């Protein structure tokens, strides 16, 4: 059964799809030992955790980094690196998705990033054009758009096909000359369906529209390249495949677009050179309380103030986790996980569950449907067997990661059967 997020936060102490992108060759991990990486995480013996897409465990190396940061914070030592320096989270994340650090802003969550993009594009009324999304997009983003629809915005939701995909031709039928934005998930939270994001972007750009992608199930889980895809905006939290924690995420905004959109928020993080004038330095003439210059960067457009957890802990945690991911190699992470996914796709349907993940998906999740599965004996079996997967009312999602091996999959299958 799935652990509730509030329980995860208590346990951790509250520390703060596309073919062109999936063809990166794997390289040998820098860190010794290969896969699985069981010794890198504090997963208790006898417990099988197959729920990384819900919340990924934090590596030991990152926990150690947070402890050191806490010691520095207790003695009021300043952060070791200024934001933007080599090795900081923005730099590491930008490298991960082939962006510039100046195209990355911190946000509190994926939802916060999506909201900021919609606000920056001025989308909330019937006269603002239309937004196209699909039924496999993140449910929180769909909720946001449906609420805007109540206010008059033209929102068009493309239905999944019978084989649980989004057909590009269905998207094409929904897009027209008034489309301002296409919103999709690069890999669906529900079943791991992966858009051909390059095709989606080509479609949008041909109509003068932008593309926002929720990449929370791509970043860190599969090779992802914002330049190869052509995506205009993308956002993700860090508590899943980036092995971070709640309260901090990343928003990517294409550099060339920053002059075309409006700032949705204002705050002191956007103007690092800001200075206040107080006696005895009051200027002559008209009184100006502060002097500042807003940055023409993603941070200068979308950031406003300190995030949950503060820079001391978040920077330490994400720097360690993103460095760890870089050393292992995302393509290697994906290559290790894929045989586990294929085994699940082969065996679970034999137990009476319907597969809803496309057979060719290379994402980190595999989902199976069964009516009222949440009310069957399956959750009880899994809980008794100390196996953790995501179970909803009518579906079950399994998401192995780098600490899992085929023995974990066999154990899950044994408990399930």
Segments the model singles out, each with a brief description of its role:
Residues 6:
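Residues within the helices of the helix-turn-helix
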Residues 1-3:
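N-terminal secretory signal peptides
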Residues 9-417:
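Pyridoxal 5′-phosphate
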């Amino acid at each position: 059964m799935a652990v509730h997020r509030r329980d995860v936060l208590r346990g951790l102490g509250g520390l703060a799809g596309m073919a062109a992108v999936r063809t990166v060759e794997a390289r040998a991990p820098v860190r010794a030992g290969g896969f699985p990486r069981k010794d890198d995480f504090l997963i208790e013996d006898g417990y099988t955790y197959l729920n990384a897409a819900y919340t990924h465990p934090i590596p030991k190396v990152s926990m150690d980094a947070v402890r050191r940061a806490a010691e520095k914070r207790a003695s009021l030592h300043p952060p070791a690196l200024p934001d933007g320096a080599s090795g900081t989270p923005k730099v590491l994340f930008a490298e991960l998705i082939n962006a510039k650090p100046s195209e990355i802003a911190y946000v509190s969550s994926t939802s916060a990033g999506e909201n900021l993009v919609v606000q920056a594009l001025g989308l909330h009324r019937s006269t603002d054009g239309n937004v196209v999304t699909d039924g496999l997009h993140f449910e929180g983003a769909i909720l946001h758009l449906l609420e805007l629809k109540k206010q008059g915005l033209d929102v068009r939701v493309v239905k999944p096909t019978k084989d649980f995909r989004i057909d590009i031709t269905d998207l094409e039928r929904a897009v027209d000359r008034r489309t301002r934005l296409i919103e999709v998930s690069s890999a669906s939270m529900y079943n791991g369906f992966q858009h051909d994001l390059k095709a989606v972007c080509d479609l949008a750009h041909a109509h003068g529209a932008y593309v926002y992608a929720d990449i929370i199930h791509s970043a860190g889980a599969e090779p992802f390249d914002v330049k190869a895809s052509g995506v205009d905006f993308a956002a993700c939290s860090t508590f899943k495949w980036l092995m971070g924690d709640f309260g901090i995420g990343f928003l990517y905004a294409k550099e060339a677009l920053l002059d075309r959109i409006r700032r949705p928020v204002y705050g002191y993080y956007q103007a690092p050179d800001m200075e206040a004038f107080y006696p005895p330095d009051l200027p002559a003439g008209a009184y100006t309380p502060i002097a500042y210059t807003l940055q023409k960067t993603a941070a200068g457009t979308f950031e406003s103030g300190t995030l949950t957890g503060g820079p001391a802990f978040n920077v330490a945690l994400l720097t360690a986790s993103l460095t760890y991911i870089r050393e292992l190699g995302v393509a290697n992470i994906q290559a290790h996980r894929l045989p586990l996914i294929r085994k699940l796709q082969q065996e679970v349907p034999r137990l009476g569950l319907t597969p809803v993940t496309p057979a060719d998906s290379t994402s980190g999740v595999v989902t199976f449907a069964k009516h009222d599965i949440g009310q069957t004996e399956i959750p009880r079996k899994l809980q008794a067997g100390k196996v953790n997967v995501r179970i909803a009312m009518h579906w079950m999602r399994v998401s192995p990661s780098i600490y899992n091996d085929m023995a974990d999959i066999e154990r899950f299958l044994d408990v399930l059967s």
